[in-house]
């Protein structure tokens, strides 16, 4: 699926002043495109509010990042679980009313998660970098910043908030973007989980190379339906090029039971990312224990 970036606003000049004129007739074609367009605006505003130099100064005072990839590889329970701290989503609305990131993070750590994922998008997922900071102050597990990254600035935001890894979504980034953002992330000590949804995106990612974490999202971006066969089909199609002995493959979305984890593990997934299935449970720690079979 092609995701367009919003066209730059045309400029008009009045005397010595220049103004941007919005494209009122241009509309996003789907929810992901809408998120991307809003994220562009959000990042522009964030840059004005918190200059990059301010983020760099904060980062210089932080301890080194934790090794996200190593944590997944050394997990005692397989597949390793990346448990997600998520209040809401565009497709499901509010998932957890009594959303307490600190309590959830503690429950995940006690329940056997190898790493945590934290939603930082505010408008569509009701998350935030403040949530990431709270979780970082609560647990010692490696943290993934789950964000719609379009700009290097967001990588600095993630690192400054305590992330150890970041998500790059192939569907919303060009090959050039993926290469550059991966390079910037590595310079900040951040591991990168690059996410694909179909064969075309996985082909692009493998051609670019340099990713030690590849996520296969089982959710169809057009319908938002999930199908675990997505992981099975893509791994089978690209098995010889995935280098599963060195690359950590993560299956994402649609995982609700231990049988689901067993299914994607049999296909080749060394780790899984689980959010909604846990967030909807009253006792998150017990739910995670049950999911991993511990």
From Swiss-Prot:
InterPro entries: Aldolase_TIM, Indole-3-glycerol_P_synth, Indole-3-glycerol_P_synth_dom, Indole-3-GlycerolPSynthase_CS, RibuloseP-bd_barrel. Pathway: Amino-acid biosynthesis; L-tryptophan biosynthesis; L-tryptophan from chorismate: step 4/5. GO terms for molecular function: indole-3-glycerol-phosphate synthase activity; phosphoribosylanthranilate isomerase activity. Its EC number is 4.1.1.48. Disulfide bonds: none annotated. Transmembrane segments: none annotated. It comes from the Bacteria. GO terms for biological process: L-tryptophan biosynthetic process. It catalyses: 1-(2-carboxyphenylamino)-1-deoxy-D-ribulose 5-phosphate + H(+) = (1S,2R)-1-C-(indol-3-yl)glycerol 3-phosphate + CO2 + H2O. Keywords: Amino-acid biosynthesis, Aromatic amino acid biosynthesis, Decarboxylase, Lyase, Tryptophan biosynthesis. HAMAP family: IGPS_B. Belongs to the TrpC family. NCBIfam families: PRK00278.1-4, PRK00278.2-4. This is Indole-3-glycerol phosphate synthase. It comes from Synechococcus sp. (strain CC9902). The gene is trpC.
């Amino acid at each position: 699926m092609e995701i367009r970036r919003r066209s730059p606003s045309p400029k008009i000049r009045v005397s010595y002043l220049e103004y941007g004129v919005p494209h009122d007739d241009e509309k996003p074609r789907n929810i992901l495109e809408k998120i991307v367009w809003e994220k562009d605006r959000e990042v522009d505003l964030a840059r004005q509010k918190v200059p990059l130099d301010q983020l760099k100064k904060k980062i210089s005072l932080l301890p080194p990042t934790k090794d996200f990839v190593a944590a997944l590889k050394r997990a005692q329970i397989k597949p390793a679980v990346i448990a997600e701290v998520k209040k809401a989503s565009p497709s499901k609305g509010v998932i957890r009313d009594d959303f307490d990131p600190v309590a959830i993070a503690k429950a995940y750590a006690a329940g056997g998660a190898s790493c945590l994922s934290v939603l930082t998008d505010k408008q569509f997922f009701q998350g935030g970098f403040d949530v990431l900071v709270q979780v970082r102050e609560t647990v010692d597990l490696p943290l993934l910043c789950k964000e719609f990254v379009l700009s290097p600035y967001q990588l600095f935001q993630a690192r400054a908030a305590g992330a150890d890894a970041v998500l790059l979504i192939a569907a919303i980034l060009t090959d050039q973007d993926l290469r550059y953002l991966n390079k910037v992330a590595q310079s900040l000590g951040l591991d990168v989980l690059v996410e694909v949804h179909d064969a075309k995106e996985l082909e692009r990612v493998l051609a670019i190379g340099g990713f030690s974490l590849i996520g296969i999202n089982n959710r169809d971006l057009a319908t938002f339906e999930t199908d675990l066969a997505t992981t099975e089909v893509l791994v089978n199609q690209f098995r010889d090029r995935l280098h599963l002995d060195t690359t950590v493959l993560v299956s994402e979305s649609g995982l609700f039971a231990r049988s689901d984890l067993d299914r994607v593990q049999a296909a080749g997934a060394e780790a899984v990312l689980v959010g909604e299935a846990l967030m909807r449970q009253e006792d998150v720690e017990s739910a995670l224990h049950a999911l991993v079979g511990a």
